[in-house]
From Swiss-Prot:
InterPro entries: Ribo_uL30_ferredoxin-like_sf (IPR036919), Ribosomal_uL30_bac-type (IPR005996), Ribosomal_uL30_ferredoxin-like (IPR016082)
Protein name as it appears in the record: Large ribosomal subunit protein uL30
GO molecular function, a single term: structural constituent of ribosome
Gene Ontology BP terms: translation
Quaternary organization: Part of the 50S ribosomal subunit.
Pfam (any one): Ribosomal_L30
Residue ranges, annotated region (Disordered): 1-20
Gene Ontology terms: cellular component: cytosolic large ribosomal subunit
Recorded family membership: Belongs to the universal ribosomal protein uL30 family.
Source organism superkingdom: Bacteria
SUPFAM superfamilies: Ribosomal protein L30p/L7e
Length: 61
């Protein structure tokens, strides 16, 4: 199982930890999407920036 993560809000006014987590997930701008594996580490990063992204489950890796 994999997760499609899309950034829906910008990073102006957010904390450094949140910006760093977005970069670690591979997100650089609004409406940019990446597919990441469904692991506890990725879920933890998503939890930190949950107000800035949307997450969808997709089949495959």
């Amino acid at each position: 199982m994999a997760l499609k993560i899309t950034q829906v809000k910008g990073t102006v006014g957010t904390r450094k930890k949140q910006k760093d987590n977005l970069r670690s997930l591979g997100l650089k701008r609004i409406r940019h999407s990446v597919v990441q594996p469904d692991t506890p580490q990725v879920r933890g990063m998503i939890n930190v920036v949950r107000h800035l992204v949307t997450v969808e489950e997709v089949a495959g890796e």
